[in-house]
Amino acid sequence: MAKKEVAKIKLQIPAGAANPSPPVGPALGQHGLNIMGFCKEFNARTQDQKGMIIPVVITVYADRSFTFITKTPPASVLIMKAAKIEKGSGEPNRNKVGSLTMAQVEEIAKLKLPDLNAAGLESAIKSIAGTARSMGIDVK
């Protein structure tokens, strides 16, 4: 018989830097999970992606065990890293803060494709380009 699923917890944690402090501790603690066990396993799985924010979906079972799935970093984080900026524009229509080439956008789209709800690479590229434009980044 399959384990009974109690909850799904979605968090965004810096790769290789999960620790029991908020937001990880309280989110897992209220479901009675082993916080340090999760932190060690997450850090081991994401140590090669240091410096990135990694979304994780933790599935909690009735016997207080858990499994988790790591996803690709958010598109906005990948775009900011490619454009070498700290944050997007407060007024994206007026103030442009950086620029990306179509090759860079395509590379980000290929990386994000497994997690995107896109029909194919073309639509994924359009989605990433739209995200970049909404952050005040020119796509050339």
From Swiss-Prot:
One or more lysine residues are methylated. GO terms for molecular function: large ribosomal subunit rRNA binding; structural constituent of ribosome. The keyword Amino-acid biosynthesis does not apply. Transmembrane segments: none annotated. GO terms for cellular component: cytosolic large ribosomal subunit. Forms part of the ribosomal stalk which helps the ribosome interact with GTP-bound translation factors. Part of the ribosomal stalk of the 50S ribosomal subunit. Interacts with L10 and the large rRNA to form the base of the stalk. L10 forms an elongated spine to which L12 dimers bind in a sequential fashion forming a multimeric L10(L12)X complex. Keywords: Methylation, Ribonucleoprotein, Ribosomal protein, RNA-binding, rRNA-binding. One of its GO terms (biological process) is translation. The keyword Ribonucleoprotein applies. This is Large ribosomal subunit protein uL11. HAMAP family: Ribosomal_uL11. SUPFAM superfamilies: Ribosomal L11/L12e N-terminal domain, Ribosomal protein L11, C-terminal domain. Belongs to the universal ribosomal protein uL11 family. InterPro entries: Ribosomal_uL11, Ribosomal_uL11_bac-typ, Ribosomal_uL11_C, Ribosomal_uL11_C_sf, Ribosomal_uL11_N, Ribosomal_uL11_N_sf.
